[in-house]
Amino acid sequence: MGDLPTSQQALKVASSGRVILETGHPLPELGADEVLVRVACVALNPYDAKSVDMSPSPGATAGLDFAGEIVALGEAVNSSTRLAVGKRVCGFVFGNNPDRRDNGAFAEYVAVPASLVLCIPDSMTFLEAATLPCGLATTGTALYNSHNLGLPLLRPGSEVNSSNKSSTYVLVYGGGTATATIIIQVLRRSGFIPITTSSPHNFNRLQQLGAEATFDYHSPTCGSDLRDYTHNRLAFAIDCISSTDSMQICYEAIGTAGGRYVSLDPFPLNKHTRRSIRPVWLFSFTIFGSAIKWDTPYNFPARPDDRESAERWYAEIEAILATGELVTHPFQEETGGLSSVIDGIGAVRNGQITGYKLVYPIRNCAY
């Protein structure tokens, strides 16, 4: 690491709802099982605003999603064709981390476990790659982790028994979100049949991604329409909106026999109206295997099994990425680097960004 700078710029959490750009901060300490990445681009997610609003860690580096190139390897990471200095990668990190305030995506350098970083295929730019990591981490956790839907991780090309077709439907509520863009494609590749909800202007795009059917969530009969379409046998729902209304529609859609409901945020307990449904909300930061020490309800004990599950999932999704077939969510490239990310966080907080992600080049993102 002798050729690297001794300090960097980083967006630091200052107080509740406030991040500031600071200079002169040391690069993150590199763990033995980690790689150090020079950040090329970062992308914004709802939790970039939500986390600093609800559980700020003053002095911590903010940011979850990045793309860049490896500049150093931890002492326990074997240099290989896959992970070597100069390799283009993208990843998801635990920004605003009270236990590791020197590390987050919104900086010039970021450290990430070697087993939880994804190689970027030659056909994909840094800009495109930066839109993926949080959605990919959430997808694997939601669909295949035993704490959540617990679906079997089927290989691409797996055949679904047509006589049991209705039991393989999975409802993806909130099809217009970035996470749903990924989930729908992965479900289809895994042999399941995704159906989704959105505004009508998204219907064509979602069907091109692999959704078998799309439903207008504005319709007062949306829940019953979903149940009818799946012959009263829908057993799996993942809620990418996680509101009172979305939970109610998901519960209406799930068949009489019940099933599993996964929310991406804490769900309203008064909407858990059916004992036959097992509700759970996931927090993707558990994939790192360490305790999450944010304020309640965002505090979680360490889950080493989530780390193991995520590592298996990352190996699978990297192989899918390598095919060049995974479609990214629509995005808008912004200018101004890290300093402009502050305004972007405000726009996300205020609900001004819908249907696309904001991506910020930190340096040259042309390749």
From Swiss-Prot:
Q: InterPro entries from the entry?
A: ADH-like_N (IPR013154), GroES-like_sf (IPR011032), NAD(P)-bd_dom_sf (IPR036291), PKS_ER (IPR020843), Trans-enoyl_RdTase-like (IPR047122)
Q: One Pfam family for this entry, by name? A: ADH_N
Q: Which Gene3D superfamilies match?
A: Medium-chain alcohol dehydrogenases, catalytic domain, NAD(P)-binding Rossmann-like Domain
Primary enzyme class:
oxidoreductase
**Listed EC numbers:** 1.-.-.-
Say what happens when this gene is deleted: Impairs the production of oxopyrrolidines A and B.
Residues noted as binding NADP(+) in the record, renumbered to the chain = 47-50, 199-202, 217, 264-265, 353-354
Keywords (alphabetical) are:
NADP, Nucleotide-binding, Oxidoreductase
The molecular function terms in GO held by this entry are:
nucleotide binding; oxidoreductase activity, acting on NAD(P)H
**According to its UniProt record, in which pathway does this protein act?**
Secondary metabolite biosynthesis
Family to which this protein belongs: Belongs to the zinc-containing alcohol dehydrogenase family.
Assembly description? Monomer.
So what does this one do? Trans-enoyl reductase; part of the gene cluster that mediates the biosynthesis of oxopyrrolidines, polyketide-amino acid hybrid compounds with feature structures of tetramic acid. The polyketide chain is first assembled by the highly reducing PKS module of opdA using acetyl-CoA as the starter unit and five malonyl-CoA as the extender units. OpdC acts as a trans-acting enoyl reductase and reduces the terminal alkenyl to alkane. The 17R in oxopyrrolidine A and 15R, 17S in oxopyrrolidine B are generated by non-stereospecific catalysis of the ketoreductase (KR) domain and enoyl reductases.
Q: What's the protein name?
A: Trans-enoyl reductase opdC
Organism of this sequence:
Penicillium oxalicum (strain 114-2 / CGMCC 5302)
| Gene name of the record | opdC
